[in-house]
Amino acid sequence: MRLDRIIAVRNDKTVYKDGNRCLKVFRSGYSKADVLSEALNQARAEEAGIPVPKIREIAVIDGKWTIVSDYVTGKTLARLMVEEKEKKKEYTELFAELQIGLFSKKCPLLTNLRDKMRRKIAETGLDKELCNRLYERLEALPEHDKLCHGDFDPSNVILTDEGTPCILDWAHATIGNASADVAQTYLLFRLKGDIPGAESYLKLFCQKTGTAREYVEKWMPIVAACRMAKCNEKERGFLYSWVNAPDEY
């Protein structure tokens, strides 16, 4: 095994290039069940006809669980949006269209989003009254069966050297309401401080699907609470401001 270079470093994983393979090496002690779940989600996405890196094996390297997949050559949309600022609107439109395309795919065996949200709200450490209010909001919103990526961010979409998209990181994939996934992506833009990008993205999604912005906004307090289950202190303050949005929001 020859690890050419580190591609990315996260709190719980390091991603390496190894020739024509990509190795996602999880930290020691990382849940085996979570690793296998992520790999299974990605395999199901592939079987649904979604462009994803093909998984080649699940391995243990130096005692650490590792997902081995094809290495995809290209640049992320996040990088392209920075390098080619004059084309940011074009890339944002492509990004929105890719997500809309995901919503048309069927992956019935994925985790139910509503069930996952209930669990995440319980893990936030928020007071009981606020949690109950979030549960009530969640129950009042429609339950759908759309494929939701759960972490759909420009950094998780590669535009290959051939000009085709490839979607990464399927750890949080579920089936549920598409507008919840859109609310998640909107907040990801906002967490990075890209308010114009967030607004442009949401406007494009609403225009292309005929979805009212107000409907997407109803999901934002719930999505923000779910992200609070695993976030740093800086993010927590920002997310809490969304969780505490008025009930009529």
Residue ranges and their predicted role:
Residues 40-51, 102:
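Structural motif at the C-terminus of the N-lobe alphaC helix and the adjacent alphaC-beta4 loop
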Residues 169-173:
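Activation of the activation-loop gatekeeper triad in protein kinase-fold domains
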